[in-house]
Amino acid sequence: MTPALKSTFVLAHRHLLGIEGLSAADITGLLDLSEEYVELNRQVDKKRASLRGRTQVNLFFEASTRTQSSFEIAGKRLGADVMNMSVSSSSMRKGETLMDTAVTLNAMHPDILVVRHHASGAVELLARKVDGSVINAGDGAHEHPTQALLDALTIRRNKGRLEGLVVAICGDVMHSRVARSNILLLNTMGARVRVVAPSTLLPRGIERMGVEVARDMREGLDGADIVMMLRLQRERMNGSFVPSSGEYFHYFGLDQKKLAYAKPDALVMHPGPMNRGVEIDSIVADGAQSVIREQVEMGVAVRMAVLEALARNLPNA
């Protein structure tokens, strides 16, 4: 028999649309609940009945392997009826608008919608039209809250804290929803955030988000506790932002030489998918300081915690 959870945390929001708006207490509550699911997921019996009788729809307008499968596993382990909606075979391909889709889905009374969309703000717009809870699984270059939470959980489990750590976020910051959500979370939790990228991949006014800015890896990684690499998101680029992949790797790709600028016990992270030989070297990605595979494991636990925390707010929960 699965033991009862110790955490009674309830997310005081109907939806999880972003890290923005979450307090330090919210983040800590979700991370603490996630810790319990890490342990559960390492048992033979990984099931709980928290979402039994609930319907979870995964609605992905952008292709995703890790995030969609992670949410599917999370929902099924909690006992939900999980439906994956393929946009490529849906009415959206026939001209139906996002709002039409929202209204249609709402008529089916789903309890939780997990939504990924290529346009920033689209998930929030959809959330206004449905009665159930909505989780943002990534919207354009805006936010990806569960990725930031799983990154925070990975860091906290390895370093024991978030406060006071120096976190270097390196690469395509301009097009990265992961960077934005991580910056918001890490600042809220008292970490010191540094973004490292060529000028062409830095959003104008990024300093206003409370980060330090470095334009070369030696300066950016100096004294870093965490080195978080981002992939080049060419699908969001209109035009050339870097001369070539080879030149980009030479200056901004993480290899053993550049990693040596960070602290000796620095963690190497990457949200995936990785472009090996572009933003990160295979030796580093698979090396002793890498926690990239652990991030994937933490993703399932975090998404179970988010689903649980939102489900506790649902009617008749």
Swiss-Prot record:
GO cellular component: cytosol
Reaction(s) the record says it catalyses: carbamoyl phosphate + L-aspartate = N-carbamoyl-L-aspartate + phosphate + H(+)
GO biological process: 'de novo' pyrimidine nucleobase biosynthetic process; 'de novo' UMP biosynthetic process; amino acid metabolic process
Residues annotated as binding L-aspartate: 94, 177, 231
Top EC class, one word: transferase
Keywords: Pyrimidine biosynthesis, Transferase
Pathways per UniProt: Pyrimidine metabolism; UMP biosynthesis via de novo pathway; (S)-dihydroorotate from bicarbonate: step 2/3
Superkingdom per UniProt: Bacteria
InterPro entries per UniProt: Asp/Orn_carbamoyltranf_P-bd, Asp/Orn_carbamoylTrfase, Asp/Orn_carbamoylTrfase_sf, Asp_carbamoyltransf, Asp_carbamoyltransf_Asp/Orn-bd
UniProt-listed PROSITE patterns: CARBAMOYLTRANSFERASE
Residues annotated to bind carbamoyl phosphate: 66-67, 116, 144, 147, 272-273
EC number: 2.1.3.2
Gene Ontology MF terms: amino acid binding; aspartate carbamoyltransferase activity
Classification via Pfam families: OTCace, OTCace_N
Protein role: Catalyzes the condensation of carbamoyl phosphate and aspartate to form carbamoyl aspartate and inorganic phosphate, the committed step in the de novo pyrimidine nucleotide biosynthesis pathway.
Subunit and partners: Heterododecamer (2C3:3R2) of six catalytic PyrB chains organized as two trimers (C3), and six regulatory PyrI chains organized as three dimers (R2).
NCBIfam families membership: asp_carb_tr, PRK00856.1
Family listed: Belongs to the aspartate/ornithine carbamoyltransferase superfamily. ATCase family.
HAMAP family listed in its UniProt record: Asp_carb_tr
Official protein name in the record: Aspartate carbamoyltransferase catalytic subunit
Gene this chain is encoded by: pyrB
